[in-house]
Protein backbone atom coordinates (compact mmCIF):
# COMPACT_ATOMS: atom_id res chain seq x y z
CA UNK A 1 0.00 0.00 0.00
CA UNK A 2 2.80 2.35 0.92
CA UNK A 3 4.79 1.50 -2.22
CA UNK A 4 1.71 2.14 -4.30
CA UNK A 5 1.31 5.63 -2.91
CA UNK A 6 4.98 6.36 -3.50
CA UNK A 7 4.72 5.14 -7.07
CA UNK A 8 1.66 7.27 -7.70
CA UNK A 9 3.43 10.28 -6.21
CA UNK A 10 6.46 9.75 -8.44
CA UNK A 11 4.26 9.44 -11.47
CA UNK A 12 2.48 12.68 -10.62
CA UNK A 13 5.82 14.45 -10.02
CA UNK A 14 7.13 13.23 -13.38
CA UNK A 15 4.01 14.47 -15.14
CA UNK A 16 4.25 17.94 -13.54
CA UNK A 17 7.96 18.16 -14.35
CA UNK A 18 7.37 17.16 -17.96
CA UNK A 19 4.62 19.74 -18.34
CA UNK A 20 6.81 22.45 -16.79
CA UNK A 21 9.78 21.62 -19.00
CA UNK A 22 7.53 21.52 -22.02
CA UNK A 23 6.11 24.91 -21.18
CA UNK A 24 9.62 26.33 -20.68
CA UNK A 25 10.85 24.89 -23.97
CA UNK A 26 7.77 26.22 -25.75
CA UNK A 27 8.37 29.68 -24.24
CA UNK A 28 11.98 29.62 -25.44
CA UNK A 29 10.85 28.45 -28.87
CA UNK A 30 8.30 31.26 -29.06
CA UNK A 31 10.89 33.81 -27.94
CA UNK A 32 13.32 32.55 -30.56
CA UNK A 33 10.69 32.67 -33.28
CA UNK A 34 9.62 36.19 -32.38
CA UNK A 35 13.17 37.49 -31.97
CA UNK A 36 12.47 38.49 -28.36
CA UNK A 37 16.04 37.90 -27.23
CA UNK A 38 19.50 38.94 -28.36
CA UNK A 39 22.07 36.25 -29.04
CA UNK A 40 25.39 36.39 -27.26
CA UNK A 41 26.62 39.29 -25.18
CA UNK A 42 28.06 39.41 -21.67
CA UNK A 43 26.41 42.53 -20.20
CA UNK A 44 29.78 43.97 -19.21
CA UNK A 45 28.50 47.57 -19.36
CA UNK A 46 24.94 46.76 -18.36
CA UNK A 47 22.30 49.06 -19.87
CA UNK A 48 24.94 51.55 -21.03
CA UNK A 49 27.35 51.91 -23.90
CA UNK A 50 30.64 53.73 -23.54
CA UNK A 51 31.93 56.48 -25.78
CA UNK A 52 35.23 55.08 -27.00
CA UNK A 53 38.23 57.46 -26.92
CA UNK A 54 36.09 60.11 -25.20
CA UNK A 55 38.78 60.80 -22.57
CA UNK A 56 41.75 62.48 -24.20
CA UNK A 57 45.34 63.40 -23.42
CA UNK A 58 46.01 66.88 -22.09
CA UNK A 59 47.49 69.32 -24.62
CA UNK A 60 50.68 69.61 -22.54
CA UNK A 61 51.31 65.86 -22.26
CA UNK A 62 54.67 65.38 -23.94
CA UNK A 63 57.81 63.28 -23.43
CA UNK A 64 55.99 60.28 -22.00
CA UNK A 65 53.79 62.14 -19.51
CA UNK A 66 50.17 61.18 -19.01
CA UNK A 67 47.32 61.71 -16.56
CA UNK A 68 47.76 60.77 -12.93
CA UNK A 69 45.03 58.78 -11.20
CA UNK A 70 41.58 60.16 -12.02
CA UNK A 71 40.00 60.45 -8.59
CA UNK A 72 36.83 62.52 -8.89
CA UNK A 73 34.08 63.78 -11.16
CA UNK A 74 31.19 66.23 -10.85
CA UNK A 75 28.75 66.86 -13.71
CA UNK A 76 27.82 70.54 -13.64
CA UNK A 77 25.90 70.25 -16.93
CA UNK A 78 25.99 67.70 -19.77
CA UNK A 79 28.49 70.03 -21.44
CA UNK A 80 30.61 70.85 -18.38
CA UNK A 81 32.20 68.02 -16.44
CA UNK A 82 34.68 68.82 -13.66
CA UNK A 83 37.43 66.25 -13.13
CA UNK A 84 39.89 65.80 -10.24
CA UNK A 85 43.24 64.16 -11.02
CA UNK A 86 46.36 63.35 -9.03
CA UNK A 87 48.50 65.56 -11.24
CA UNK A 88 50.54 64.04 -14.03
CA UNK A 89 52.75 60.96 -14.11
CA UNK A 90 55.16 59.24 -16.43
CA UNK A 91 53.37 56.84 -18.75
CA UNK A 92 55.14 53.85 -17.18
CA UNK A 93 54.61 55.23 -13.64
CA UNK A 94 58.28 55.33 -12.66
CA UNK A 95 57.90 58.74 -11.04
CA UNK A 96 55.48 60.38 -8.60
CA UNK A 97 52.80 62.65 -10.06
CA UNK A 98 53.93 65.99 -11.41
CA UNK A 99 52.52 69.26 -10.13
CA UNK A 100 50.02 70.12 -12.87
CA UNK A 101 46.61 69.12 -14.23
CA UNK A 102 44.82 68.62 -10.90
CA UNK A 103 41.45 70.11 -11.85
CA UNK A 104 40.20 70.29 -15.42
CA UNK A 105 36.84 70.80 -17.07
CA UNK A 106 35.77 68.91 -20.18
CA UNK A 107 32.79 69.38 -22.48
CA UNK A 108 30.27 66.85 -23.77
CA UNK A 109 32.84 65.57 -26.29
CA UNK A 110 35.56 65.10 -23.68
CA UNK A 111 37.57 68.11 -24.89
CA UNK A 112 39.41 70.08 -22.20
CA UNK A 113 37.86 73.55 -22.03
CA UNK A 114 39.24 74.74 -18.67
CA UNK A 115 42.34 73.99 -16.61
CA UNK A 116 42.32 75.37 -13.09
CA UNK A 117 46.11 75.51 -12.99
CA UNK A 118 45.98 78.70 -10.90
CA UNK A 119 45.16 76.47 -7.91
CA UNK A 120 47.76 73.74 -8.49
CA UNK A 121 49.72 74.73 -5.38
CA UNK A 122 46.73 73.75 -3.19
CA UNK A 123 46.74 70.15 -4.37
CA UNK A 124 48.68 66.96 -4.01
CA UNK A 125 45.97 64.29 -3.81
CA UNK A 126 42.57 65.79 -4.62
CA UNK A 127 40.33 62.96 -3.54
CA UNK A 128 36.88 63.79 -4.90
CA UNK A 129 35.00 66.77 -6.35
CA UNK A 130 31.38 67.87 -5.82
CA UNK A 131 28.64 70.37 -6.61
CA UNK A 132 25.82 70.56 -4.08
CA UNK A 133 22.43 69.90 -5.74
CA UNK A 134 20.92 72.47 -3.36
CA UNK A 135 23.29 75.32 -4.24
CA UNK A 136 21.92 77.78 -6.85
CA UNK A 137 25.43 79.19 -7.35
CA UNK A 138 26.88 75.75 -8.14
CA UNK A 139 30.06 76.12 -6.09
CA UNK A 140 32.72 73.48 -6.67
CA UNK A 141 34.01 71.58 -3.64
CA UNK A 142 37.18 69.50 -3.44
CA UNK A 143 38.42 67.18 -0.69
CA UNK A 144 42.23 67.23 -0.56
CA UNK A 145 44.03 64.42 1.30
CA UNK A 146 47.29 66.34 1.55
CA UNK A 147 50.90 65.19 1.56
CA UNK A 148 54.11 66.43 -0.06
CA UNK A 149 53.86 69.71 1.86
CA UNK A 150 50.12 70.16 1.21
CA UNK A 151 47.77 70.04 4.22
CA UNK A 152 44.51 68.10 4.36
CA UNK A 153 41.69 70.46 3.55
CA UNK A 154 38.19 71.08 2.22
CA UNK A 155 38.10 73.67 -0.56
CA UNK A 156 35.12 75.57 -1.97
CA UNK A 157 35.45 77.51 -5.24
CA UNK A 158 33.17 79.64 -7.34
CA UNK A 159 31.69 77.69 -10.21
CA UNK A 160 34.12 79.10 -12.76
CA UNK A 161 37.15 78.59 -10.52
CA UNK A 162 38.00 82.27 -10.33
CA UNK A 163 37.80 82.50 -6.54
CA UNK A 164 38.46 80.33 -3.51
CA UNK A 165 35.57 81.17 -1.18
CA UNK A 166 36.21 78.77 1.72
CA UNK A 167 39.15 76.71 2.97
CA UNK A 168 38.91 74.34 5.94
CA UNK A 169 42.55 73.42 6.51
CA UNK A 170 44.11 71.08 9.04
CA UNK A 171 46.84 73.16 10.74
CA UNK A 172 49.06 70.08 11.09
CA UNK A 173 50.97 68.32 8.37
CA UNK A 174 49.59 64.96 7.31
CA UNK A 175 49.86 62.37 10.07
CA UNK A 176 50.42 58.66 9.67
CA UNK A 177 47.55 56.28 10.31
CA UNK A 178 48.95 55.39 13.74
CA UNK A 179 49.51 59.03 14.71
CA UNK A 180 46.02 60.08 13.63
CA UNK A 181 44.31 57.19 15.42
CA UNK A 182 46.23 57.90 18.62
CA UNK A 183 44.14 61.08 18.89
CA UNK A 184 40.88 59.68 20.26
CA UNK A 185 39.12 63.07 20.26
CA UNK A 186 40.08 64.88 17.06
CA UNK A 187 38.93 68.48 16.72
CA UNK A 188 36.83 69.89 13.86
CA UNK A 189 39.92 70.40 11.69
CA UNK A 190 42.00 67.45 12.90
CA UNK A 191 41.46 65.56 9.68
CA UNK A 192 42.49 61.95 9.20
CA UNK A 193 42.75 61.70 5.42
CA UNK A 194 39.28 63.15 4.62
CA UNK A 195 37.52 61.34 1.81
CA UNK A 196 33.96 62.36 0.96
CA UNK A 197 31.30 65.09 1.21
CA UNK A 198 27.51 64.94 1.14
CA UNK A 199 25.12 67.88 1.20
CA UNK A 200 21.88 68.55 3.05
CA UNK A 201 18.88 70.64 1.91
CA UNK A 202 19.52 73.32 4.57
CA UNK A 203 23.03 73.98 3.26
CA UNK A 204 24.86 71.97 5.91
CA UNK A 205 27.30 69.34 4.70
CA UNK A 206 28.72 66.06 5.96
CA UNK A 207 32.38 65.10 5.81
CA UNK A 208 33.48 61.48 5.81
CA UNK A 209 36.76 61.58 7.73
CA UNK A 210 37.98 59.26 6.36
CA UNK A 211 40.99 57.01 5.84
CA UNK A 212 42.37 57.39 9.39
CA UNK A 213 39.58 58.90 11.50
CA UNK A 214 36.36 56.92 11.75
CA UNK A 215 33.76 59.66 11.85
CA UNK A 216 31.09 61.65 10.03
CA UNK A 217 31.31 65.38 10.79
CA UNK A 218 28.52 67.90 10.14
CA UNK A 219 29.34 71.53 9.32
CA UNK A 220 27.22 74.58 8.49
CA UNK A 221 27.30 76.02 4.99
CA UNK A 222 30.00 78.42 6.28
CA UNK A 223 32.16 75.61 7.62
CA UNK A 224 31.28 75.91 11.31
CA UNK A 225 31.38 72.66 13.27
CA UNK A 226 27.95 71.30 14.29
CA UNK A 227 28.27 67.68 15.42
CA UNK A 228 29.78 64.31 14.62
CA UNK A 229 29.28 60.59 15.11
CA UNK A 230 31.33 57.43 14.73
CA UNK A 231 34.66 56.06 15.86
CA UNK A 232 37.33 53.72 14.55
CA UNK A 233 36.39 50.04 14.73
CA UNK A 234 34.21 47.32 13.27
CA UNK A 235 31.16 47.42 15.52
CA UNK A 236 27.79 49.06 14.80
CA UNK A 237 28.33 52.77 14.21
CA UNK A 238 32.09 52.37 13.88
CA UNK A 239 34.11 52.77 10.70
CA UNK A 240 37.31 51.69 9.03
CA UNK A 241 37.69 54.01 6.05
CA UNK A 242 34.62 56.13 5.39
CA UNK A 243 34.67 56.56 1.60
CA UNK A 244 31.13 57.28 0.40
CA UNK A 245 28.05 59.04 1.83
CA UNK A 246 24.54 59.54 0.47
CA UNK A 247 21.40 60.96 2.10
CA UNK A 248 17.91 59.84 1.05
CA UNK A 249 14.64 61.80 0.94
CA UNK A 250 13.88 60.71 4.51
CA UNK A 251 17.21 62.12 5.75
CA UNK A 252 18.71 58.69 6.37
CA UNK A 253 22.47 58.64 5.95
CA UNK A 254 24.13 55.79 4.03
CA UNK A 255 27.86 55.32 4.60
CA UNK A 256 30.28 53.09 2.72
CA UNK A 257 32.46 51.55 5.42
CA UNK A 258 35.09 50.39 3.00
CA UNK A 259 37.53 48.25 4.99
CA UNK A 260 34.69 46.69 6.99
CA UNK A 261 33.12 45.64 3.66
CA UNK A 262 29.69 47.04 4.35
CA UNK A 263 27.26 49.93 4.07
CA UNK A 264 25.85 51.33 7.31
CA UNK A 265 22.61 53.30 7.61
CA UNK A 266 21.89 56.01 10.19
CA UNK A 267 19.22 58.53 11.10
CA UNK A 268 19.88 62.19 10.36
CA UNK A 269 21.12 62.52 13.96
CA UNK A 270 23.65 59.73 13.54
CA UNK A 271 21.72 57.00 15.34
CA UNK A 272 22.58 53.55 14.00
CA UNK A 273 19.81 51.77 12.05
CA UNK A 274 21.39 48.79 10.30
CA UNK A 275 24.23 47.47 8.19
CA UNK A 276 24.35 45.85 4.77
CA UNK A 277 27.21 43.34 5.09
CA UNK A 278 29.32 41.49 2.52
CA UNK A 279 29.84 44.36 0.08
CA UNK A 280 33.48 43.89 -0.72
CA UNK A 281 34.87 47.35 -1.51
CA UNK A 282 32.16 50.06 -1.52
CA UNK A 283 33.64 53.42 -2.52
CA UNK A 284 30.68 55.53 -3.65
CA UNK A 285 26.92 55.65 -3.06
CA UNK A 286 24.28 57.33 -5.23
CA UNK A 287 20.55 57.25 -4.46
CA UNK A 288 18.19 58.03 -7.34
CA UNK A 289 14.59 59.20 -7.54
CA UNK A 290 13.28 55.64 -7.87
CA UNK A 291 14.68 54.74 -4.42
CA UNK A 292 17.49 52.68 -5.95
CA UNK A 293 20.75 52.76 -4.01
CA UNK A 294 23.71 52.44 -6.39
CA UNK A 295 27.03 51.36 -4.89
CA UNK A 296 30.31 51.44 -6.78
CA UNK A 297 32.69 48.61 -5.81
CA UNK A 298 36.34 49.40 -6.53
CA UNK A 299 37.82 45.91 -6.24
CA UNK A 300 35.03 44.05 -8.02
CA UNK A 301 34.96 46.84 -10.65
CA UNK A 302 31.20 46.69 -10.52
CA UNK A 303 28.08 48.82 -10.16
CA UNK A 304 25.63 47.34 -7.64
CA UNK A 305 21.94 48.21 -7.33
CA UNK A 306 20.15 47.85 -3.97
CA UNK A 307 16.72 48.70 -2.66
CA UNK A 308 16.41 51.12 0.26
CA UNK A 309 16.02 48.00 2.41
CA UNK A 310 19.41 46.69 1.28
CA UNK A 311 18.27 43.98 -1.16
CA UNK A 312 20.67 43.40 -4.06
CA UNK A 313 18.63 43.90 -7.24
CA UNK A 314 21.10 44.10 -10.11
CA UNK A 315 24.76 44.59 -10.98
CA UNK A 316 27.07 45.04 -13.94
CA UNK A 317 30.67 45.97 -14.70
CA UNK A 318 34.00 44.23 -15.30
CA UNK A 319 37.70 44.91 -15.01
CA UNK A 320 39.88 46.06 -17.91
CA UNK A 321 43.57 46.90 -17.70
CA UNK A 322 45.29 49.15 -20.21
CA UNK A 323 48.72 49.63 -21.72
CA UNK A 324 50.70 49.75 -18.46
CA UNK A 325 50.71 45.93 -18.59
CA UNK A 326 51.27 45.80 -22.30
CA UNK A 327 47.77 44.77 -23.31
CA UNK A 328 44.86 46.81 -24.51
CA UNK A 329 41.64 47.17 -22.57
CA UNK A 330 38.13 47.56 -23.87
CA UNK A 331 35.77 50.55 -23.77
CA UNK A 332 33.94 50.75 -20.47
CA UNK A 333 36.22 48.44 -18.56
CA UNK A 334 36.70 49.59 -14.98
CA UNK A 335 39.97 49.93 -13.11
CA UNK A 336 39.50 50.87 -9.44
CA UNK A 337 36.42 53.05 -10.02
CA UNK A 338 36.50 55.84 -7.44
CA UNK A 339 33.66 58.35 -7.85
CA UNK A 340 30.55 58.59 -10.02
CA UNK A 341 28.07 61.26 -11.06
CA UNK A 342 25.11 61.70 -13.40
CA UNK A 343 24.24 64.59 -15.69
CA UNK A 344 20.78 65.93 -16.52
CA UNK A 345 20.59 63.85 -19.71
CA UNK A 346 21.05 60.54 -17.89
CA UNK A 347 24.71 60.06 -18.80
CA UNK A 348 26.90 58.37 -16.21
CA UNK A 349 30.50 59.37 -15.47
CA UNK A 350 32.94 57.16 -13.56
CA UNK A 351 36.39 58.29 -12.45
CA UNK A 352 38.75 55.32 -12.88
CA UNK A 353 41.53 55.71 -10.32
CA UNK A 354 43.59 52.83 -11.68
CA UNK A 355 43.12 53.71 -15.34
CA UNK A 356 43.78 56.51 -15.35
CA UNK A 357 40.77 57.82 -17.26
CA UNK A 358 37.21 59.10 -17.02
CA UNK A 359 34.47 57.02 -18.65
CA UNK A 360 31.25 58.44 -20.08
CA UNK A 361 28.40 55.91 -20.19
CA UNK A 362 25.30 56.72 -22.24
CA UNK A 363 22.05 54.70 -22.07
CA UNK A 364 21.72 52.06 -24.76
CA UNK A 365 18.84 52.40 -27.17
CA UNK A 366 15.91 50.45 -25.78
CA UNK A 367 17.60 49.83 -22.43
CA UNK A 368 15.44 48.53 -19.60
CA UNK A 369 14.65 51.71 -17.63
CA UNK A 370 14.74 49.82 -14.33
CA UNK A 371 18.44 49.15 -14.91
CA UNK A 372 19.33 52.77 -15.61
CA UNK A 373 20.50 55.13 -12.88
CA UNK A 374 17.98 57.91 -12.41
CA UNK A 375 18.34 61.49 -11.26
CA UNK A 376 19.75 62.09 -7.80
CA UNK A 377 17.20 61.81 -5.02
CA UNK A 378 16.82 65.07 -3.10
CA UNK A 379 15.70 65.66 0.45
CA UNK A 380 13.39 68.29 1.90
CA UNK A 381 13.97 70.81 4.66
Q: Language-model segments: which ranges?
A:
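Bacterial N-terminal signal peptides
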Residues: 7-18
